[in-house]
Amino acid sequence: MTKILYGNEVALKIKEDLNLRIDKLKEKNIIPKLAILRMGNKPDDIAYERSIIKSCEKLNIETKVEELNEDILEEDFLKLMESLNNEKEIHGILVFRPYPKHLNENTINSSIALNKDVDCMHPLNLERIFEGDLNQFVPCTPEAVIEILKYYDIDLKGKNIVIINRSMVVGKPLSMMVLSNNATVTICHSKTIDLPSITKKADIVVTAIGKAKLIKEEYFNEDSIVMDVSINVDENGKLCGDVDFENVKEKVGAITPVPKGVGSVTTTLLLKHIVDAAERNS
């Protein structure tokens, strides 16, 4: 029988630990605080911002939102970032992506203080991952995949893992993280030939394509562990992943649902990183 790997159970366990840690920080008169930088007024960004603020409020994490014009000059953005980097009460900084085209992505990412880079956007923090150092900040989404597997006692050692994504947000950092856990990893992408023949041989398949229900049962074997990272909207306006969940769920060993899967853990790990930063900087 297929095991459903619910992320909300993992998130709840992490939050229970965070509550205890936040209480200890309060005893030192330290309140974890996140600065959010949003450029423009995209509905998706605003919805995500509200979700983060709500999650922070539940754990008594403070937030400071900087609503910026989409045409903000890079010079002005960097001045604001410098100010936030120097503000002692701010423990974490989150900049919403993608950036407006006139801003240099590497310049923006490099402007975030390393000790406040809670979503691991700074090139030096990413470099640490590729050197095998997972003790600092790591990107929240790849970490969520790892945390779910650990929670359900799925050992990565010796496993063959296929990741269908080659971005610096998910695929590349996740590949380094599973390598550090002694797995063997294959990265696939849109130009990969005969993808099902590759994924079907894997022990674990991680998909982050961004195409609703694209991945069907022929991509898996009966023991496949399926980690669906994407959050898409189907033809009926309902949230779904890359995997055709209803048709696949009884034909694999284990699978994460969408929603209540990887996404719920991703947001919780962002909160954890804020608390981590507050503890390190206290």
Curated annotation (Swiss-Prot):
InterPro entries: Aminoacid_DH-like_N_sf, NAD(P)-bd_dom_sf, THF_DH/CycHdrlase, THF_DH/CycHdrlase_cat_dom, THF_DH/CycHdrlase_NAD-bd_dom. It comes from the Bacteria. One of its GO terms (cellular component) is cytosol. One of its GO terms (molecular function) is methenyltetrahydrofolate cyclohydrolase activity. NADP(+) binds at residues 165-167, 190, 231. Its EC number is 1.5.1.5, 3.5.4.9. GO terms for biological process: L-histidine biosynthetic process; methionine biosynthetic process; purine nucleotide biosynthetic process; tetrahydrofolate interconversion. It catalyses: (6R)-5,10-methylene-5,6,7,8-tetrahydrofolate + NADP(+) = (6R)-5,10-methenyltetrahydrofolate + NADPH; (6R)-5,10-methenyltetrahydrofolate + H2O = (6R)-10-formyltetrahydrofolate + H(+). Keywords: Amino-acid biosynthesis, Histidine biosynthesis, Hydrolase, Methionine biosynthesis, Multifunctional enzyme, NADP, One-carbon metabolism, Oxidoreductase, Purine biosynthesis. Coiled coil: none annotated. Catalyzes the oxidation of 5,10-methylenetetrahydrofolate to 5,10-methenyltetrahydrofolate and then the hydrolysis of 5,10-methenyltetrahydrofolate to 10-formyltetrahydrofolate. Belongs to the tetrahydrofolate dehydrogenase/cyclohydrolase family. This is Bifunctional protein FolD. It comes from Clostridium botulinum (strain Kyoto / Type A2).
